[in-house]
């Protein structure tokens, strides 16, 4: 009987489990009568060692072995476990000891899925009230603040790092963080910040004005998804260890908000080669472990503000597998209801004006987007989403202004590109059904998340499906979306892009938030009316927590701040 081994990482020295796998491959589950010499030859050891190994396996309940004694009495061997059962048992013991990485490394993909189904029994044996476990759908690709773009990375970076300013979502206003005070000159071209004394990074190195200056200059000088947003920084001047100033090319009343974003989190000047995956931060949690299977955060005992209420947060990478209900907290839960909050922005379409279908024809681009939006392709009563009338919930943008005599081509194919986490099947089916009305076919290409943001696929795309989620500061979140989103900037030809940049430059010079919000709406009206961006839906944010989890404060990004979580008795 030949079977595939459950173990996929053999070691140079044969392990007991591998010896059992050899026996199972030779004899299977049937009763066998091998002599000790034959067993020693199979296990590549002496007869004495073979006898010892068989005794160990019998003690563990893997097999029953009765040696033959005397002439005519044959030995009898019966194997009681399949290698898969044995591998799972070994993995369960490792998980119970907290050795998740070793457990997964020893199993092939089907057995890993089986192990996940048995997690509830394993977790039930753990009564650690200071720990919280939650699943995540994919690995974390970077923990360097200036590279963080997706909200998973952004949220974890916010737990590991702090910024000069913090933001209160309830009042939609800035509050002190690493800096306890800041002020601007009359035209907002020069900003000065004063730091709290005694600040340190997780490794004990000082967090002073020089460290802040070096960290902020990275935003302007190093490659990152939001580098474009800091091009107006002309110079940084340190006055003394607790104070520094920023000189800007243009007046910018949004400068403190720029320094609140996750990309502006303060990193140490000296960074190890593995900083991208194992960073040293300054936030409420510090990184204890980062492996392909798990991310572990531990409370920072020297945090300058209120200490987190939990000691340990574990994020388990489950890939596409369904997460068992035994986890304490589940973000983006599959089961949603109309009572769940809507995401802070929307899922939307970007047309590629130079793609194969549009080929620079503006009338065709506007005509197709109007056809896709009038009426909404979504069906009523969908618990996971609502039709988007504008970029934000509650906003209403004008319809796409298509030319009356624009005739849509009948038939053909349009290629839609998206990334895995922004491709709700119901929404894509609705677009397919709408296009079928003109005999057109939608070819959907789902691109792995890191590759999506390299945009090497752009020239082959006609439409791009994306999703935007703002952070708690809705004001600067809109500015960042309109001015810094790489997909939107690629979709705009030079003329419209220059107009949007000019509008945003004017917005940053408005000192009042209300005036800026009106200006954002005007930008959104223009983008939608001209067919450069089409809001489709507002997704609902699913969040499920155990009955004993308290302190749930869900921000506009949909994530819960780990610092406020605690367990009820």
Over which residues does each language-model region extend?
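Detector for C-terminal structural segments
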Residues: 367-399, 422-430, 459-569
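Ligand/substrate-recognition segments at binding pockets and active sites
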Residues: 29-37, 43, 47-49, 61, ...
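Ligand-site clamp/hinge motif
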Residues: 302-344
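A structural "hinge/loop" feature
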Residues: 139-153, 205, 255-261, 544-563
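Surface-exposed binding/hinge segments that line
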Residues: 76, 227-270, 284-289, 294
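A bilobed periplasmic-binding-protein/Venus flytrap-type ligand-binding module shared by bacterial periplasmic
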Residues: 298-301, 341-367, 371
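N-terminal lobe/hinge region of extracytoplasmic solute-binding protein
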Residues: 135-184
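Aromatic- and charge-enriched surface segment that lines or borders ligand/interaction sites
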Residues: 28-32, 42, 47, 51-53, ...
């Amino acid at each position: 009987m030949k079977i595939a081994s459950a173990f996929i990482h053999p070691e140079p020295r044969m392990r007991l489990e591998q010896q059992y796998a050899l026996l199972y491959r030779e004899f299977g589950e049937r009763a066998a009568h091998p002599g000790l010499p034959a067993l020693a030859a199979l296990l590549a050891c002496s007869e004495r060692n073979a006898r010892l190994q068989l005794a160990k396996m019998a003690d563990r309940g893997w097999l029953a072995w009765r040696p033959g004694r005397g002439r005519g009495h044959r030995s009898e061997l019966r194997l009681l476990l399949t290698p898969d059962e044995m591998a799972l048992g070994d993995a369960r013991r490792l998980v119970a000891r907290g050795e998740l990485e070793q457990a997964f490394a020893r199993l092939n993909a089907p057995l890993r899925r089986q192990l996940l189904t048995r997690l509830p029994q394993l977790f039930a044996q753990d009564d650690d009230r200071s720990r919280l476990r939650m699943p995540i759908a994919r690995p974390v690709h970077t923990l360097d603040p200036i590279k963080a773009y997706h909200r998973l990375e952004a949220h974890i970076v916010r737990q590991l790092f702090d910024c000069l300013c913090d933001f209160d979502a309830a009042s939609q206003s800035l509050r002190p963080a690493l800096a306890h005070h800041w002020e601007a000159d009359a035209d907002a071209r020069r900003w000065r910040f004063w730091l709290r004394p005694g600040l340190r990074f997780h490794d004990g190195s000082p967090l002073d004005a020089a460290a802040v200056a070096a960290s902020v200059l990275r935003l302007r000088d190093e490659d990152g998804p939001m580098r474009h947003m800091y091009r107006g920084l002309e110079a940084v001047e340190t006055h003394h260890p607790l104070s520094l100033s920023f000189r800007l090319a243009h007046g910018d009343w949004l400068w403190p908000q720029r320094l609140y974003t996750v990309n502006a989190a303060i990193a140490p000047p000296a960074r190890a080669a593995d900083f991208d995956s194992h960073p040293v931060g300054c936030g409420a949690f510090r990184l204890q472990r980062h492996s392909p299977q798990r991310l572990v955060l531990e409370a920072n005992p020297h945090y300058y503000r209120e200490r987190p209420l939990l000691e340990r947060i574990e994020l388990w990478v489950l890939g596409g597998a369904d997460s068992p209900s035994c986890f304490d907290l589940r973000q983006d839960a599959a089961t949603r209801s109309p009572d769940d909050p809507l995401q802070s922005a929307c899922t939307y379409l970007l047309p590629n004006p130079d793609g194969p279908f549009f080929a620079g024809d503006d009338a065709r681009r506007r005509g197709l987007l109007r056809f896709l939006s009038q009426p909404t392709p979504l069906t009523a009563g969908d618990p996971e989403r609502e039709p988007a009338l504008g970029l934000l919930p509650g906003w209403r943008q004008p319809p796409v202004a298509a030319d009356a005599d624009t005739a849509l081509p009948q038939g053909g194919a349009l290629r839609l590109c998206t990334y895995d986490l922004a491709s709700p099947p119901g929404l894509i089916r609705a677009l397919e059904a709408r296009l079928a009305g003109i005999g057109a076919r939608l070819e959907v290409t789902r691109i792995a998340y890191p590759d999506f943001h390299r945009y090497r696929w752009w020239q082959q795309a006609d439409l791009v499906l994306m999703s935007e989620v703002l952070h708690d500061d809705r004001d600067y979140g809109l500015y960042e979306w309109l001015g810094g989103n790489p997909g939107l900037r690629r979709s705009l030809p030079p003329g419209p892009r220059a107009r949007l940049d000019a509008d945003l430059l004017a917005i940053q010079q408005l000192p009042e938030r209300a005036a800026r919000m009106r200006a954002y709406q005007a930008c959104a009206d223009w983008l939608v009316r001209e067919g450069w961006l089409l809001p489709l839906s507002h997704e609902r944010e699913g969040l499920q927590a155990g009955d004993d989890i308290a302190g749930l404060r869900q921000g506009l990004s949909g994530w819960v701040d780990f610092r406020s979580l605690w367990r009820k008795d």
